[in-house]
Amino acid sequence: MTEPYEGYHGLSFAEEFGPTAFTMMARAEGMRDMGPCLAPQNAWNILHGLETLSLRMEKHCSNALKMVEYLSNHESVAWVSHASAPGHPDKELAEKILPKGTGSMIAFGIKGGKEAGAAFINNVKLASHLANVGDARTLVIHPASATHSQMDEATLKFAGLSHDMIRLSVGLEDFEDIVNDFEDGFRAAKKPLSLIHI
């Protein structure tokens, strides 16, 4: 923003717009790259999604609260991280600023480490093994055996990850269906590695 921008005849956004430089640059580049208005289909998709957002978030948050309780009491789970979880450092703040729910993202540690995490992921069927979040479907990923599998121990730790961590984005399915699916995954994670179908 402080250097002359060739795409705008050498304009320096910082010099020209001062404190609003970032806003002006984002606006100018957005207009250049995407045009001044949405395509009709894109506008319809956004509107269609917004109309049911509050209902979907209610279900996401409800399922997440139940999931935190389920995981917190499960013998195969070492730890649970979610703003509603007992002992979470931000629990009080989250309840104050997010009274209707703290979202559907949960991280938990599976007992048995990397092998158990991989076995769990490969044996759930309802939950999708995907790296994205916020879907209508329940999504799970074991970063140590998937997205971050090339990292050594020190780099994993620096990234805030552990071999036992599973990231969960709770979906809109019936809660009992999610639990039944997770029970299949937990059973597989307890088997000796040679007996696990991966």
Language model segments and positions:
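Pyridoxal 5′-phosphate
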Residues: 168
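Structural/interface elements that position substrates and couple domains in central-metabolism enzymes
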Residues: 191-193
